[in-house]
Amino acid sequence: MANYTAADVKRLRELTGSGMMACKNALAEAEGDFDKAVEQLRIKGAKDVGKRAERTTAEGLVVSKDGVLLELDCETDFVAKNEDFLKLAESIVTVAAAAKPADVDALKALDLDGKTVDTVIQEQSAKIGEKLVLSKIASFDGPVAVYLHKRSADLPPAVGVLVEYTGEGDAAAEAARGAAMQVAALKAKYVTRDEVPEDIVANERHIAEETARAEGKPEQALPKIIEGRVNGYFKDVVLTEQSSVQDSKKSVKAILDEAGVTIKRFVRFEVGASS
C-alpha cells in the first residue's frame, strides 16, 4: 500500500515540475518522506542533464518579434507544442527583441527574470525532461517582413524567414512578405546572382560542361548548353531570379520592382535542418 497520497503527488509535481510517475516513484523510494522525495528528484534532474546533452533535437519551433528570428529546439513534437515550451520561446524572443544580441552566445548571457537565458533554458530542460537547444538567432534593423510556416496545424511554426528590405507603404510590405514566403517555399540562398561566390559558379560551370560532354553533346553547342544550365542553377538559388510562387507568370524581381522594394538580406531557419 502506498505511503503517500494523491495530494502529495500533486504538491510534489507543482513544486518540482517533474512528471507524475517520477513524483510517484520518488515518494515511494522516500517511503512517503516529502523532503527526501524532493531531494531525490533534484539529484535525478542533475544527473539527467548529462544524459540529455547527448540526445538529438530534431523538433522545436521558430518564433519572431520586432526584427528578430530565433529557433528553439527540443526532442519531440509533444514538447514542441507544450505550453511551457511555447512560453519559454516567447520570453526568450522578447528579451532578444529588446537587446538585439549579435549571436546565440550573447543571447544566452542576457538576463531573463533575474537569471541568464541559458540558466532558464537548462531549468526548463530539467522540468520538461528533454534536451532544449537555443540553436539560431538573427536580428535585422528593418524594415523587415516575416513569414512563419507550420508543417502541421497542431504544431508551432517550424520554418521561419526574416527579410530586411527598403520600400514604403502597404504594397512594399506585402511584396516583402511575399518574398519571405518565396524563400520559405523554395529555399533561395542569395538575393542576387552577384552574391553567389565565384568558386561556386565556376564549379557549376565545370559540372555543366562535364555533364554535357558525357551526354555526347556537340562541341559547338557546349557554350550555350553550359550557360543555360548555369542560369538554371541561378534560378534555383537566387531569390530575384525565381518565378514567383504567388504569380508564376512573373519573376520575384518583377513583383518587387512593381512595389518599389529592394531586398537587402534574408535568413531562413528550419527546425531539424543544419545551419
From Swiss-Prot:
GO terms for molecular function: translation elongation factor activity. It comes from the Bacteria. One of its GO terms (cellular component) is cytoplasm. Gene3D superfamilies: 1.10.286.20, DNA helicase RuvA subunit, C-terminal domain, Elongation factor Ts, dimerisation domain. Its main location: cytoplasm. InterPro entries: EF-Ts_dimer_sf, Transl_elong_EFTs/EF1B, Transl_elong_EFTs/EF1B_dimer, Transl_elong_Ts_CS, UBA-like_sf. Keywords: Cytoplasm, Elongation factor, Protein biosynthesis. PANTHER family: ELONGATION FACTOR TS, ELONGATION FACTOR TS, MITOCHONDRIAL. Belongs to the EF-Ts family. Associates with the EF-Tu.GDP complex and induces the exchange of GDP to GTP. It remains bound to the aminoacyl-tRNA.EF-Tu.GTP complex up to the GTP hydrolysis stage on the ribosome. This is Elongation factor Ts.
